[in-house]
Amino acid sequence: VNWNYGDAYKRHPINKGIAKFSNGSMLQCHDIFNPLPEFMLNADLLFTDAPWNKSNLASFYTKAEITAFIDSYDQFYTRLFECIKQINSDTAYCEIGKEYLAEFIIEMKKIYKYVTFYNSTYYHKKSNLCYVVRGSNKFKKPKLDGMDEEDIIEWVCENEDYKCIADLCMGRGLVAVNAYKNEKKFVGTELNHKRLSVTLERLCNIGGNYIFC
């Protein structure tokens, strides 16, 4: 099976280096188990849709054509929340499935004073259930229950009070694209360089421009 995502990686090769945008936004191909790039610490808001369980995580490495020996999903989400704590944004959102919802809420409560979660869906199908956990140091409870995750990301990028949003699993760039549309900075990392190339292409298609540094 070939996961080339429309060959965007040939037009926007980002397997090495950092893509820096004219507004200071930055994207890099990166494995979460490696030390976090410094630029990720500039974020005051975070939204990430990380792998939801061990098999999901393994498929991310397979699609990225990277051989990895993952002992447990616990190892991954522990590292994920280490990164969230290090970024130390005012507010953070994490998308997750039912299997690890309780663990994500517990981890979020270790970092943030106010934690809530929303019932959500993905791919705009009511049968595709997921959850979005929100942690913040300020009390605020946006009415996001029942919204599709794509619409939640759109709402977050449009309505939260922030200067720069981080995504630790940028994928094909929903967070970056919505931040850019709202004239906000974004920083992001992604394991799969071919998926991150799709993000670059999407941003260029709406007027973004970058250099490699």
Residue ranges and their predicted role:
Residues V1-C213:
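Class I S-adenosyl-L-methionine-dependent methyltransferase catalytic core
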